[in-house]
Amino acid sequence: MGPIGTEADENQTVEEMKVEQYGPQTTPRGELVPDPEPELIDSTKLIEVQVVLILAYCSIILLGVIGNSLVIHVVIKFKSMRTVTNFFIANLAVADLVVNTLCLPFTLTYTLMGEWKMGPVLCHLVPYAQGLAVQVSTITLTVIALDRHRCIVYHLESKISKRISFLIIGLAWGISALLASPLAIFREYSLIEIIPDFEIVACTEKWPGEEKSIYGTVYSLSSLLILYVLPLGIISFSYTRIWSKLKSHVSPGAANDHYHQRRQKTTKMLVCVVVVFAVSWLPLHAFQLAVDIDSHVLDLKEYKLIFTVFHIIAMCSTFANPLLYGWMNSNYRKAFLSAFRCEQRLDAIHSEVSVTFKAKKNLEVRKNSGPNDSFTEATNV
């Protein structure tokens, strides 16, 4: 379900916990804990593996914080970037920032130390924050796809207003907060005795009922279906119809041709965002599904390492989006450059071209005004 305190923590034997977490240790009374067999040592305790994990997580955090902060900054700063679609994109960036700043540092610490040293409050907060952010991202990507489908496929003249877009964003966070709440509620911060007089602090899922409760499995499978499979199905259907419409559309006039090309490029960019999100989260979702179906997966020697690698792959989606925006969208590329140069206006770059194009656009709009006007407006990102 989340990176902190999975069912593995509760199902390991005392000997397995001792071997994986520590290696040679002494008890508070000075008794030596026997050295574990080399083949039993958890790989995440090896120095070279820990160095790789530190580099991976720190790189994701650094790239994510810089990239997502930049996206939010340019959408707020430049008036021409304040479109409905860009507000939704900025919301994705906020969700990714939550993961970068509130989840990943503590997840890395927990993975390296083998026990939860951050206290009971963060034990409940960190898994909840990650679940919340992922669900916000999924809902936002679905809303973007449905909005573009509505405008482009059906040629609707009325677009979502900025006020309505803020309402949708608020609802996305509210719904996600409710759906992710079990991750905070059904959690236990406790001491686990490894050997007599030797304990570690654990942060684990604790569902009501028996020790191996079905509630956790039901929640995990429901989340997979409602917040991954179903949204991706809706998004795939929407973008398939959008792409079909764009390929079959014939625009009269040079200005409309230009906007048609922009629509295609923007659609490609947003499809790539969805693909990156879906592919990066697929291994972790599949692995969690395997755990839910067969709990013996928890007994794998390298369970923790496999889970950590899949978690790192999933977290790559938190910094990939700004790279895609800068690579595939000229408006974002110009906005990023303007922000780095501390320029106050976005049109400071290629300003003469912008003025000329605006004049041509106004002339073409007067000549070609008609039922396709809404189609032309649909994807100004």
From Swiss-Prot:
A lipid is attached at residue 342 (S-palmitoyl cysteine). Receptor for neuropeptide Y and peptide YY. InterPro entries: GPCR_Rhodpsn, GPCR_Rhodpsn_7TM, NPY2_rcpt, NPY_rcpt. One of its GO terms (cellular component) is plasma membrane. Pfam families: 7tm_1 (PF00001). It comes from Macaca mulatta (Rhesus macaque). The keyword Plastid does not apply. Its main location: membrane. Disulfide bonds join 123-203. Residues 1-51, 108-124, 187-216, 290-304 are extracellular. Glycans are attached at residue 11. The chain crosses the membrane at residues 52-72, 87-107, 125-145, 166-186, 217-237, 269-289, 305-325. This is Neuropeptide Y receptor type 2. Belongs to the G-protein coupled receptor 1 family. The gene is NPY2R. One of its GO terms (molecular function) is neuropeptide Y receptor activity. Residues 73-86, 146-165, 238-268, 326-381 are cytoplasmic.
